[in-house]
Amino acid sequence: THLLFNMFSLWMFGSVLENYWGPKRFLIYYFITGLGAAALHLGVSMYEVHQVKVVVQDYLANPSYNAFYTLQQINGNLFDTEQLQQFLQSWNMDQSNTQYIQYSQEIANAILQRQLNIPTVGASGAVYGLLLAFGMLLPNTFLFMIFIPIPIKAKYFVMIYGALELYQGVANNAGDNVAHFAHLGGMLFGYFLIKYWNKRRRDTFY
């Protein structure tokens, strides 16, 4: 679904923008927003890794049953819930058991490694940059989307999508394997690039 949306958006919005800008400027915009998406995603990922690393290191230095609750909430979906609950119940009955403590430290290291090795593939950040450009250059163009039964102006569509990406990025729900801040990075860099270009030329379609 995510890939289909990207391909559809690239065709729908990209073809209009390429006709407006021309192939050269379109490619410049596409690559810059793609790089901007990667930059913001990398920055956010490094911050998240640092946060997890600090918590894990604190736990490894002073492991305990109570402290493990805080730790496993970081990425509890890494392990089977039933298996984890069984382990916690057993450990609760014998909190000084060194084998349980050692196993909890292994879980802590696994959480950190999982955070360090999260793969990221795709160019959807650049696609969201195109979506932002469409909304800025053709703000009052009506869009008819399958999942929205009424026509909606491009500027409002972009605002809604941007707000949803920000909410989902901040929420960081378990199992959500979408790089929301990459999408926001593409939109952010696209916004500043269009503002820069419009200093010399102001064209807005309606």
Could you describe each region identified by the protein language model?
Residues 1-206:
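A detector for small-residue-rich transmembrane helices and their helix-helix packing motifs
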